[in-house]
């Protein structure tokens, strides 16, 4: 599948589950002084999560253009270190505004990945927040994932917060092993090794982080998911680098023609912040 087909497939999948398509919002947020750039698909829905406005619909799907170069969600130091982080990327997402919650989010994500796109189940891993027994049980009851591939992780990896303040909650991530040897997979590699790519983050927004650091319950529980189009395109197109997909190659080919030089993928040898524990 090319990138346009993947984007269209994602949107149609959720439209068929009664989601309303919402266009990508500007990369410079409107009326949100807490953000320099739009860094996630949920930014435009923040007033809904905070109960400041009423939602026009209870379910939404879109593909959001994002920039991450500063703040809490900053990928700048990862760019060039690996082949799957970018300052600009496209986030596929589906949302529930006080409608469905964890059960549907998990079930539909697995359905899309394994039935529609037919990703190899033997390469997929799921993580949940360490205290989220509900999400853990749903993964093992609703899907046919190997229970040993459902991992409990801490706040750093599985409690999502948009910024220092604002909507937040536990999350469940789906990771994909891109290595050559399936037998070399280990649970200890998830969230650590670059052989395991985070493809989709299912966020269960139920709290609001206040300036003093405390949490208050939101008036309703919501679902906010984000999946990287570039990474999914890499997997579905049988590549090992985002730069070798149809999203980047036309640009690279044009640069080659102008520069009169051939493209070679060379990564920095310095350790990434992930490897150095930062």
Annotate each predicted stretch with a short phrase.
Residues 100-155, 175, 179-181, 255-262:
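Conserved, charged catalytic cores of large soluble enzymes
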Residues 268-275:
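Conserved small/polar residues in nucleotide/adenosyl-binding loops
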Residues 177, 191, 224-235, 239-263:
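Internal glycine-rich alpha/beta core junctions
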Residues 86-90, 117-119, 211-214, 229-235, ...:
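Short acidic (Asp/Glu) and glycine-rich catalytic loops that position anionic groups and cofactors
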Residues 2-6, 102-105, 135, 248:
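Hydrophobic (often cysteine-bearing) scaffold residues that line and stabilize catalytic clefts
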Residues 216-219, 266-267:
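Active-site-adjacent structural elements in folded domains
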Residues 1-97, 147-214, 221, 237-240:
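Class II aminoacyl-tRNA synthetase-like tRNA-binding/catalytic domains
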